Amino acid sequence: MSQTQSLAVKTRAGLGKGACRKLRADDMVPGVYYDAKGVNVPVMVEHLPLQKLYSKIASSHVFDLQIEGETKPALVWKVEHHPTKPRITHVDFYGVDLTKEIQVRVPVEVVGKSKGQVKGGQLEIHREFIEVLCLPLVIPDKIVLDITNVDINESILIADVVLPEGVKAVYDNNYAVIGVLASAAEAAGEGA
């Protein structure tokens, strides 16, 4: 991303359910800023600027968090939404050290139509996100998987996913990210 986004927040004194309800009634969102060194700071932020920022960068981009005049690099770490309204009810920010690698979830985007789908197979997406380890400023927007060469009963494994330079997938077992299965009719035809 060429231009760093920014968001201004204020520290808050009131903690607990009652204080948070009062903030939400005033169109503010309660939250917590977790410093890279382990310091937690209760904060509040206006809903509209937070919503605009989150819709642009989600959880995979570093932005400048301005706390009482001090600017800190941060990620939106966790967001809670209202169950029936399009509103953010709570947000957690994570302060990052730009020189240390962090582990984040990056969305997967599947492109193309596989050979297996052309033959009647069904695409199975096993993972919508991939955990990666990288420096905060090189977090990819998304991981694009081209599936055009995947045939029926084949998969793309996490070890086979091509990642940008400086980005490593985090996994213990070599799991399938996507696969193409035979359709139920084809599977029944093979068994007969």
Curated annotation (Swiss-Prot):
CDD domains: Ribosomal_L25_TL5_CTC (cd00495). Keywords: Ribonucleoprotein, Ribosomal protein, RNA-binding, rRNA-binding. The keyword Transferase does not apply. GO terms for biological process: translation. One of its GO terms (molecular function) is structural constituent of ribosome. SUPFAM superfamilies: Ribosomal protein L25-like. One of its GO terms (cellular component) is cytosolic large ribosomal subunit. InterPro entries: Rbsml_bL25/Gln-tRNA_synth_N, Ribosomal_bL25/Gln-tRNA_synth, Ribosomal_bL25_b-dom, Ribosomal_bL25_C, Ribosomal_bL25_long, Ribosomal_L25_dom, Ribosomal_uL5_bac-type. It comes from the Bacteria. This is one of the proteins that binds to the 5S RNA in the ribosome where it forms part of the central protuberance. HAMAP family: Ribosomal_bL25_CTC. Belongs to the bacterial ribosomal protein bL25 family. CTC subfamily. Part of the 50S ribosomal subunit; part of the 5S rRNA/L5/L18/L25 subcomplex. Contacts the 5S rRNA. Binds to the 5S rRNA independently of L5 and L18. This is Large ribosomal subunit protein bL25. It comes from Solidesulfovibrio magneticus (strain ATCC 700980 / DSM 13731 / RS-1) (Desulfovibrio magneticus). The gene is rplY.
